[in-house]
């Protein structure tokens, strides 16, 4: 069965969790589809895990279009979200031009990083029938402004700003919200207040969906893994089994556990 935005809204209404994973090619997208992953994110994380950069900033729109098309050819049932890369949505018209390419490549939704300043671009896209995911909290394209990959929303003023931004973005037309590296308590409140499905990564167990970068989930790649990551390949006899284990853990609420969350 093909997953649609309506499917995800129904899951939220029924308080049923859904699993999200990143993919960048047809083969792994197919395996995720077979494992029951509801949503595949074609992430600009490809800049780090595929291209070897130390951030997502060097990723180009043409990179995202290429990998989105590859994923679409492999996944026939999953709902596909494609990241809009750094500096590709500064104005509504610029956002529309990029979204057009990604949607024509096979995306069902595009993702933008930022707060309420995105509202004009989101409203413009929404009026034209483009589904949008708004990414809040730790937004990797702003890593240089943050001074590193740090938990966001720890202070009361930061938390309130994030809640206000989420409401503004949803009112502007955001269909899904994604929270990265935010305290569990804040993510829980935001998820309860939002009508849109909320996906978390490093945001505790109370969001409607969970997302992990595929390479992190499989325990591959150099460097120390973030606190919110779990290696699902360890103890599994295949990549397919690891993907299924992740889906089951998300749906049952077993993942993320307290050890993967920021209880601040």
From Swiss-Prot:
Its EC number is 2.1.2.11. The active site is at 180 (proton acceptor). It is found in: Cytoplasm. It holds the Pfam family Pantoate_transf. The keyword Magnesium applies. Mg(2+) binds at residues 44, 83, 113. InterPro entries: Pantoate_hydroxy_MeTrfase (IPR003700), Pyrv/PenolPyrv_kinase-like_dom (IPR015813), Pyrv_kinase-like_dom_sf (IPR040442). It is an enzyme of class 2 (transferase). The keyword Cytoplasm applies. 3-methyl-2-oxobutanoate binds at residues 44-45, 83, 111. GO terms for molecular function: 3-methyl-2-oxobutanoate hydroxymethyltransferase activity; magnesium ion binding. GO terms for cellular component: cytoplasm. Homodecamer; pentamer of dimers. Belongs to the PanB family. This is 3-methyl-2-oxobutanoate hydroxymethyltransferase 2. It comes from Hahella chejuensis (strain KCTC 2396). The gene is panB2.
């Amino acid at each position: 069965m093909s997953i649609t935005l309506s499917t995800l809204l129904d899951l939220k209404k029924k308080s049923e969790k859904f699993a999200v994973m990143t993919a960048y090619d047809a083969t792994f997208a197919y395996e995720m589809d077979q494992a029951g992953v509801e949503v595949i994110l074609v992430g600009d994380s490809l800049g780090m895990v595929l291209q070897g950069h130390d951030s997502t900033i060097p990723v180009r729109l043409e990179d995202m279009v290429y990998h989105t098309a590859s994923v679409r050819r492999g996944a026939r049932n999953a709902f596909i979200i494609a990241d809009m890369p750094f500096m590709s949505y500064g104005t509504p018209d610029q956002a529309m031009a990029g979204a057009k390419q990604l949607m024509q490549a096979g995306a069902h939704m595009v993702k933008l990083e930022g707060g309420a300043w995105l509202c004009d671009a989101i409203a413009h896209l929404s009026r034209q029938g483009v589904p949008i995911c708004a990414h809040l909290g730790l937004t990797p394209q702003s890593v240089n402004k943050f001074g590193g990959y740090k938990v966001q929303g720890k202070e009361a003023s930061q938390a309130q700003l994030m809640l206000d931004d989420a409401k503004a973005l949803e009112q502007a037309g955001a269909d899904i919200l994604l929270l990265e590296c935010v305290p569990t308590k804040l993510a829980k409140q935001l998820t309860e207040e939002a009508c849109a499905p909320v996906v978390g990564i490093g945001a505790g167990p109370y969001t409607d969906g969970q997302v992990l970068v595929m390479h992190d989930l499989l325990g591959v790649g150099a460097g120390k893994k973030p606190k919110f990551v779990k290696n699902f390949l360890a103890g599994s006899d295949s990549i397919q089994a690891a993907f299924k284990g992740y889906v089951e853990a998300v749906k049952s609420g077993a993942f993320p556990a307290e050890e993967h969350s920021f209880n601040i």
